[in-house]
Amino acid sequence: MSILKKLKCQKKKYLIYLNKCLKYKLLDNILWVISMFKPKALYCENNIENYVLGRELLEKYADVPKVIIDNHNNIEEMRKKQNKDFADMKRNLIIGVRKTHKFVPNHKTSDFLVPYTSSGCTAMCMYCYLVCNYNKCAYLRLFVNREEMLDKIIRTAQNSEKDLTFEIGSNSDLILENTITNNLVWTIENFANTPKGHLTLPTKFDMVDDILPLKHNGKVTIRISVNPEEIINKVEFGTSRLKNRVQAINKLADADYPIGILIAPVILVENWKELYSNLIKYLYENLNEKAKKQAFFEIIFMTYSFVHRAINTEAFPNAIDLYNPELMRGRGRGKYMYKDYIREEGEKFLRGEMQKYFPNNQIEYVV
């Protein structure tokens, strides 16, 4: 059988199995599919061999079919795919050189949002804001020029009068990426002893063991995103279970990492008050004392879009519809957010629940 026929056969079996998992809510089975991630094809810019990481990835995936591309941002074959192919497109791995290094000012938990070693993800959260940026092409892209990117962060920190914090995970999930590239280990090892600056990154994954023994000097803050198990099951396909995320928070606290907890995104399904009340109680009952003492919180309500809905309807026909016209209003071009009074009610409720269980912990913001 030719390679092309094998790939088509694998794709058909994969999509049938994935949709069966969605129909019957078999989250563990979906996690198995994602955790066994091996790209069905590599799409590589032709200059990645000039970089150490590029050569390492080519060696690691030597048996995977390869397609040479001119630009990771413009793969015509991918752009022509249909929305129903979204999940299958996530099985590709794109490798290139990041050409844009623009730091975007930020006023939440960092001073700058920094483009770093990856964008996109192998998981399939139905609300992912990267879909707004990349449409159905929100697959994982790895950038091999990590030395250039980290060097700019270090120089910017060194030349600043104040101590800066850089958000390096706004375009991807670096805990997930680390399982493929070891980039987060490399980053922490090369940043920890610099005289100025801090790094921060969010994650929905629990695979933190590789970074626990590192000498981080308190310069890297890991923020774990949590949601009720029902939401994870129905919406956050291919991410870690709530129990495992909480265990990861405890491990990070014990390893003296600064930690944050994102309750995000808050999704107002029918029984949302019960779900999020139980979530906050679960955190209180299962976080260790060290984590409970030091963690700060962020609360983010879901923003949705026409693009999300179009892709989800075709790619995941058995999944929940997150669009609720009774609760949502338009925001900008093709985006939806919860109506102001609905969001205000949600914030009041969540702040009340947080006061019950975490009265002494800082809530950085609610948006």
Regions found by a protein language model. Name each.
Residues 2-111:
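Flexible, acidic/Gly-rich N-terminal and inter-domain linker regions that tether
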Residues 30-54, 284-367:
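Auxiliary Fe-S-binding modules of radical SAM enzymes
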Residues 87, 94-109, 126-223:
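Conserved Radical SAM active-site core
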Residues 116-125:
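Cysteine-centered iron-sulfur cluster-binding motifs in ferredoxin-type domains/subunits
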Residues 152-159, 210-215, 242-255, 350:
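Structured alpha-helical segments in the cores of large, soluble enzyme domains
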Residues 167-169, 200-204, 223-227, 262-264, ...:
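A cross-family glycoside hydrolase active-site/sugar-binding cleft signature
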Residues 172-175, 206-209, 220-239, 265-270, ...:
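Conserved radical SAM core fold
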Residues 245-308:
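Conserved C-terminal portion of the radical SAM core fold
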